[in-house]
From Swiss-Prot:
It is an enzyme of class 3 (hydrolase). Pfam families: Ribonuclease_P. This is Ribonuclease P protein component. One of its GO terms (molecular function) is tRNA binding. Its EC number is 3.1.26.5. RNaseP catalyzes the removal of the 5'-leader sequence from pre-tRNA to produce the mature 5'-terminus. It can also cleave other RNA substrates such as 4.5S RNA. The protein component plays an auxiliary but essential role in vivo by binding to the 5'-leader sequence and broadening the substrate specificity of the ribozyme. It catalyses: Endonucleolytic cleavage of RNA, removing 5'-extranucleotides from tRNA precursor. Belongs to the RnpA family. Keywords: Endonuclease, Hydrolase, Nuclease, RNA-binding, tRNA processing. NCBIfam families: rnpA. The gene is rnpA. One of its GO terms (biological process) is tRNA 5'-leader removal.
Length: 121
């Protein structure tokens, strides 16, 4: 039976302490453009994702939602490769009028860099 690629509640960082653990002790930091991934190992068989995309960094709600959708899609498609990791995506630079294709490309490259770093460790 194939493994589900759904993005369920168990695949999200939900509470402040869960986020704080990743912020306080990231094992890996992977950055690209205005994005940064903070990653640490978790004790669960599946990965968990948290998103921090502030209004100061990405002004329009539609753009914030678009970035979140693209990140969740990449995460959902790569769950098996990311098993056992807690991941937070931060937007650290100001992103004005992001091109949807460029956002997808940046997020794909970011996850590729993360997987390469995980394989080295």
């Amino acid at each position: 039976m194939p493994i589900s690629q759904a993005f369920t509640r168990q695949h999200r960082l939900l509470t402040g302490p869960q986020y704080q653990t990743v912020f306080d002790q990231p094992e890996w930091k992977v950055g690209l453009g205005g994005y940064l991934l903070l990653v640490t190992r978790n004790s669960q068989p599946h990965p968990r994702l948290g998103l921090v995309i502030g209004r100061k960094r990405v002004k329009r709600a539609v753009d914030r939602a678009r970035i979140k959708r693209r990140v969740r899609e990449q995460f959902r498609c790569r769950q098996q490769e990311l098993a056992g990791l807690d991941i937070i995506l931060l937007v650290r630079g100001r992103i004005e009028n992001p091109n949807p294709n460029q956002v997808t490309l940046d997020i794909t490259r970011l996850f590729d860099k993360l997987l390469a770093k995980c394989r080295q460790a």
